[in-house]
């Protein structure tokens, strides 16, 4: 845009200025508009000043708000509206503390307050989790007679709740004779942000009339708290109410489906979007791609991607991440190259996705080339996540010495995830000496993670150092660290069934156990011998280890799926941990014996089992 070419004749000076502002996207253009406003006297016009500052504050450009501050500082006596405008602008920015600094200047200037001054200040306090400043502003509200102003009180409730002072938040809420929707939503939002979902739900149930914000706040809270089953249950309640789901609630419901692997429910929401003609914004598009990818349907994910008219870097990244989950490294790299041909610059998350894809498929040279291109070609500094991807890439490929050297030479301090990737590789490739060394480092820097002790003990046991394995196990107990239990889920007819390793709580457990005994006989007839290597930590005899391995959660979930679905139906399983060798072996055999496709998502990736083979090629 050539701002200079805009006509600034006195007759339509204001109109042309506002028109140029709407087309402004760069700071240089903004400066030219400001210069013209100074030259033509528009900076003396209160309407023009307000429009100029409002534009700067609402702009997505990070340069415009600081420039608005420079312009504002040039005024001798800004009125209350302009003070409030600037305070509001910084309260929503990456520097909310500047709202509080502006307020200090406002107090010194003797500019009068009004009811709109305090909500923005309290928003800044909430973003900073600043309890002391909240109490000071509370005192000002009381002193100036705004203690009964609904906007000020609602903002106070939210700020106290967000800063963890629920007693004060509830006290203020209880003092309101007739709380409005904003009052209810403020206190609920505070509890949600603090992760106190039980209290938030109690308050939510007490609301006489719930609006879209109320429902969305609760649903998104459950998703953020990783309570995805509860999120979907509440979303179904919302559908049965008289409140229409908005884009945010739909996006959160789809996110819950993705985490649970609830494909049918995710498809229903997608169908609902199409029927109601809800505008497919970039957020919904990305969440849909992610949902289909995480539910094992990459073809559907690709179809959604193709139908997005304006593909953002987030959409490309979601698709590349999907290919990574499924072990389609070549496809991920292909899309990574294609997005750049389309003029889309990859970001740090895109690089994490494509490097993960390389790691999961053993594309060592390709992964290294992409990693080293980050800073050289894209001016992006690799983060700890990117270094972790390379360690995992080298470790999976058996290049343990190179992985160790890479860690020692990396400019960032290696964390537990970095060392953990190398320890896992030592276990896979049976490098006992290096594994014992890394195990010591890991427990020293991450003493409260059960997996660190388990891997270290198993490394000792692989070398038949039973005393050291027992010592590691004893240390784990002394620290009060528990091993995370294996948990698998299967979604059937809108209900998610959960199984723990050795679980007997399911109402149909007897039927499951009976079916498993039949399946086990068929497995043995087809040459199945249990893989007990990964059971070494338990230090029990072979019979006990075999009994334990047969009760792994994914076996229970698959068995239940065979009972409850028709022949030929795809069985979809979610697992919270990496699938063990025995379960992987068993699932391959089940897919062949029962002629079923089985899609299993474990902690890191997808496994598609068909005709006795797995899509991972036994590389996981």
From Swiss-Prot:
Keywords assigned by UniProt, alphabetized: Repeat
InterPro entries: DYW_dom, E_motif, Eplus_motif, Pentatricopeptide_rpt, PPR_At4g14850-like_plant, TPR-like_helical_dom_sf
GO CC term (a single one): chloroplast
Region (Type E motif): 418-493
Source organism, top-level taxon: Eukaryota
Keyword DNA damage annotated: no
Annotated region described as Type E(+) motif, given as residue ranges: 494-524
UniProt-annotated stretches for the region Type DYW motif: 525-620
Keyword Flavoprotein belongs to the record: no
Family statement drawn from the similarity comment of this UniProt entry: Belongs to the PPR family. PCMP-H subfamily.
PANTHER family, alphabetized: PENTATRICOPEPTIDE REPEAT-CONTAINING PROTEIN
UniProt protein name: Pentatricopeptide repeat-containing protein At5g66520
Gene for this chain: PCMP-H61
